[in-house]
Design a protein with these regions (language model features):
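Class I SAM-dependent methyltransferase SAM/SAH-binding core
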Residues: 49, 54-100
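A short glycine-rich, Lys/Arg-flanked "PGG" loop and its adjoining helix->strand segment in the class I
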Residues: 124-139
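A C-terminal cap/extension of S-adenosyl-L-methionine-dependent methyltransferases
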Residues: 159-162, 187, 198-271
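Acceptor-substrate binding/catalytic loop of class I
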Residues: 163-184
Length: 299
């Protein structure tokens, strides 16, 4: 049995696509994040996983990959992703927990995780899992919300917020919503055996007045010009990091899925489920989605 359960932010049943993205005035943020991800992402590869893929907003950027795994904690988000994505044959849809990922060691060439880190209670534990499933020298592109952006600094100096943006410790400003100091995040990556290669600061112009008065593509174009400054300083609300997994090669992966509870690789298909031969748990596989969130049956 692996470690105790950790609180997870669950978007099950939410209208995330419509209530947060589409028609909600975040076209600029979407464009800016796409620019950052495209600049950091290797152009092609065999197997990529996106952790916290939601409804598949960024999946079109993975066209150069033979197989793409879209993982989310909310099954309803992946059901929406199936409808949202036209060439779904390239995609593998998996419900899972970032703290207990249902994949064998060293499986993925590339890993992406955008707008997920800010929901994580235990960043070191999550990074340990990401390190486990990526191959030696594989690439991880990780986004995190930053506490040390210009707006928070100004608020703190004007005494309009209590927390210090220069304090390295994470701040939970709403339940299960965290901002991180870029230096603290770099330290966590290093301790998890990731070597930071590139950093891009993103969403320089996330200011209501600018967003209201200027076209999103103008703001995104200016953001693209400013993003490389993240190599030297990070004063934006969003930071993208490209890091390499620094670990010794253990040879080719021993399969694909593993039981997220006992980590056995011996999973046998039976009807619309996979049965773990070690612990006896049954994992749902119907509807084109592998569901490793809650077992159908437990020993």
């Amino acid at each position: 049995m692996r470690g105790a359960l950790t609180n997870v932010c669950d978007y099950e049943g939410s209208r995330y696509r419509y209530d947060f993205w589409e028609g909600q005035g975040r076209e600029y943020e979407d464009l800016a994040e796409r620019i950052a991800l495209r600049s950091l992402l290797p152009s092609s590869g065999d197997l990529l996983v996106e952790i916290g893929a939601g409804y598949g907003r960024l999946a079109d950027l993975y066209a150069g990959y033979q197989r793409v795994v879209l993982l989310d904690y909310a099954r309803s988000q992946l059901e929406e992703a199936q409808q949202y994505l036209s060439d779904s044959d390239r995609f593998i849809f998996v419900v899972g927990d970032v703290y207990r990922l249902p994949f064998v060691d060293g499986l993925f060439d590339v890993l992406t995780m955008v707008r997920v880190m800010h929901h994580l209670v235990d960043v070191p534990r999550a990074l340990t899992e990401l390190q486990r499933i990526i191959r030696s020298e594989g690439v991880a592109i990780l986004e995190h919300a930053s506490k040390q952006h210009l707006k928070s600094i100004a608020r703190w100096l004007l005494r309009r917020q209590t927390w210090n943006p220069f304090d390295p410790q994470p701040v939970e400003f709403v339940e299960l919503n965290y901002d991180f100091h870029p230096g603290w995040m770099r330290q966590q990556l290093t301790e998890a055996s990731f070597r930071v290669e590139k950093v891009r600061s993103v969403s320089h112009f996330r200011i209501p007045l600018l967003k209201k008065g200027l076209p999103p593509r103008w703001l995104a174009t200016w953001d693209a010009l400013a993003q490389p400054t993240g190599q030297w300083w990070q004063l934006t609300p969003s930071v993208f990091v490209r890091a390499q997994a620094m670990k010794s090669s253990s040879g080719p992966p021993s399969g694909f899925f593993c039981c997220p509870v006992c980590r056995s690789v011996n999973l046998s298909p039976e009807g619309a489920s996979l049965i773990c031969e070690n612990c006896g748990r049954h994992w749902r596989t119907d509807g084109g989605i592998y569901d490793f969130k809650t077992p159908l049956a437990t020993p």
